[in-house]
Amino acid sequence: MYIFKIAYDGKLSFQTQPHGETVCDKISNALLDCGYLDNKDRVPLYHGGRTDRGVAALGNYVVYEMDKKPVLPRVQSKLKWDGIWVLGCKKIEIFPEIEHRHYQYTLPNKNHDVELMKKASEKLIGTHYFQNLSKRDKTKVKDPVRTLYDIKISSNDYFITIDIFGESFLWNMVRRIIRLLSDIGKHKIENPEKFIELILSEDYKKGYPPSPAEGLILVDVKTNIDIDLDSYVIRNLKNSWEKSLNNSLMRLGLCKTVLSKT
């Protein structure tokens, strides 16, 4: 088996689908084209986290049943998508043990009360019943109790950055936590601490809406395995994201001009 550390821009969903337009499908096809993977093994055996379309990743991973050691620049050249990067790989005998997952969300700073958000976030840290802050998956029976290790919130004039660390997460759990904290920061919730206690209880059944997927990135899935990164692929990733940053800065300038002139 080989474990691959991967990154992607969020324009595709993650998990293998019949239509073939997902992160896993693109990586599998590249490995097949290189002759490293047999078609019967095209579905990954294991992964670090399943993400929805719109959610980016810098440190997810996939595990494939394969014997040949891959040359990563060659794999990268075969990827038929410019928003996926195979950053590193390592041969393994057993599946990795996950220590924690780290998500980060970037919110526009609309005069949020950041200190109130920080105070409220402390109520979410620890082991709680998170069913009301997740999307119910009727096809699977999952224990809704999860443990959050830490939540860190920082801000500047334009953005609020929220980092969430946990053992594992329910479907849409991070995005719903973000929406809750954002609404608290906008003073949309009268008694934040009391409401958090309510929404973390099994008696509350209303749930809570999610924030948009586009602000979320899976920063890392920390495991007990160290994976060496390929310098060529890292350069490719940095160049691509730098180009995106420059385009976004130009767009930001245009937006500021329009808003200041009207």
UniProtKB/Swiss-Prot annotation:
One of its GO terms (molecular function) is tRNA pseudouridine(38-40) synthase activity. Pfam families: PseudoU_synth_1. Substrate binds at Y103. It catalyses: uridine(38/39/40) in tRNA = pseudouridine(38/39/40) in tRNA. The active site is at D52. Its EC number is 5.4.99.12. Keywords: Isomerase, tRNA processing. It comes from the Archaea. Belongs to the tRNA pseudouridine synthase TruA family. This is tRNA pseudouridine synthase A. It comes from Methanococcus maripaludis (strain DSM 14266 / JCM 13030 / NBRC 101832 / S2 / LL). The gene is truA.
